[in-house]
Amino acid sequence: MPKVLHVADVHLGARPYGLEERRDDIFRSFEFVVETALKDRPDAVLIAGDLFDKPKLPLRDVKQAVELVRALTDAGIPVLAAHGEHDTPSVRDETLLSLMEASLDGFKAPLYRSGMRPGDFVVDLGSLKVAVVPFFKVPLEERRRLTLRFLREFDQISRTSSGTLVLLAHMSLDAEMQFDAVASPSDLPSGAKYAALGHLHAPRIRLDAPTPYAYPGVLDPLKVEEINTPGSPLYVDLSGDAPIIEKVKVPRRPQYRIEVDIGDGGSIYNAVNRGLRRVLANVRASREDWLKPLIHVIIKSDKPISKARVIAEARKAAGGADVLLKIHWKIVAGGEHAGTSPGLQGEGPLDLAKIAAEYYKIPLNAASTILHDLAEAAAEKDELRVREILETLATTVSQDTWKRILYMR
């Protein structure tokens, strides 16, 4: 009976913080997934969107990705991928996934083209059928309308289809994340045995839903906020009345987070050194692999600071420790220099995330994430990533909001 390996949000080609080591980490994690599948031989590997981090990548990244997927298809293991927002270009064009589909027997990644119907997105693997929801890079209301249309037709197909039907999609459900949600759990096909979903980087498993569904989470944490909730590929056994899920533990580079508050005017070196000593003691006690730990140092301050000085002293505090350091900056609200604007009135510091959330009518945590991503991309001089983030915002914010922004005086 069918057994599938469900993975999502792989982001091949990503280079978090501009580190080539992190690019290699992500490929190493996906290689582990491939090796696991080759050993256990599931009936299919399902990739629920964002196999790639960008629609266009260096040829080196594409070549390595193709070689890994080919190892599965050459072994007779079908691989099905849904498109996500990261591997779908803004303009209607061929994608890296569609090019892979054309060149690899056994790899399917249906790409929506004008005139296609939902039935064209059902991949028949014999006793297992997979209904793939295409990703529509259009404004949110239109994406929601198109997605619901596919889900309704997949529901009809699921009621009459023989064998086991699984839904594969890269989308948010409103029960998990209101921001950019396109459907509710009740909209999932009632006759589907399981919905293999992607998009949420924090894992979710909901086997008690009317149609059981899960988000494996991000394969390798891309942000410091994700290191405590890493994802896990999921083995899903569909042979019984209800899916049985087993998490696959992926060996990863250890990542640690320390926060250093230098707002009290004390020694930057001493503050960083104390935090690093605590983490390094834990690293030495628990280290089991050959990869250098990545230590995120969160510098908190309520006043202007010399970033060059902080970086120099943080590196000095790390001494000869065999680690990777990433410095993050966090302005603490309420300080004298936390933020002012001569044209705005009100009490307290300027909260850009709150302003963006209220202005664009999106949740506060979503606004914070967007601003964080923009800051990281700008710091790394990644113009393409900046453009992609802005395009995501443009397709997420409602048309009424954009009209209000464009026509306000």
Curated annotation (Swiss-Prot):
Q: Name one GO molecular function term.
A: manganese ion binding
What keywords were assigned to this record? Answer: DNA damage, DNA repair, Endonuclease, Exonuclease, Hydrolase, Manganese, Metal-binding, Nuclease
* Cofactor(s) needed by this chain: Mn(2+)
Q: What InterPro entries does the record tag this protein with?
A: Calcineurin-like_PHP_ApaH, DNA_Repair-Maintenance_Comp, Metallo-depent_PP-like, Mre11_archaea-type, Mre11_N
> Where, by residue number, does Mn(2+) 2 bind?
50, 85, 170, 199
Does this UniProt record's set of keywords contain Translocase? no
Matching entries from Pfam families are given as:
Metallophos (PF00149)
Task: Write out the residues that bind Mn(2+) 1.
Answer: 9, 11, 50, 201
Which residues of this protein are catalytic?
Answer: 86 (proton donor)
> Looking at the record's lineage, which domain of life comes first?
Archaea
Query: What EC number(s) does the entry state?
Result: 3.1.-.-
Recite the UniProt cofactor note for this protein: Binds 2 manganese ions per subunit.
What is known about regulation of its activity?
A: Nuclease activity is regulated by Rad50.
Biological process according to GO: double-strand break repair
**Subunit structure as annotated in this protein's UniProt entry:** Homodimer. Forms a heterotetramer composed of two Mre11 subunits and two Rad50 subunits.
Q: Which PANTHER family match?
A: COMPONENT OF ATP-DEPENDENT DSDNA EXONUCLEASE, NUCLEASE SBCCD SUBUNIT D
Per its UniProt record, what HAMAP family does this chain match? Mre11
Q: What does this protein do?
A: Part of the Rad50/Mre11 complex, which is involved in the early steps of DNA double-strand break (DSB) repair. The complex may facilitate opening of the processed DNA ends to aid in the recruitment of HerA and NurA. Mre11 binds to DSB ends and has both double-stranded 3'-5' exonuclease activity and single-stranded endonuclease activity.
Q: What is stated as this protein's family in its record?
A: Belongs to the MRE11/RAD32 family.
Q: What is this protein called?
A: DNA double-strand break repair protein Mre11
Which species? Aeropyrum pernix (strain ATCC 700893 / DSM 11879 / JCM 9820 / NBRC 100138 / K1)
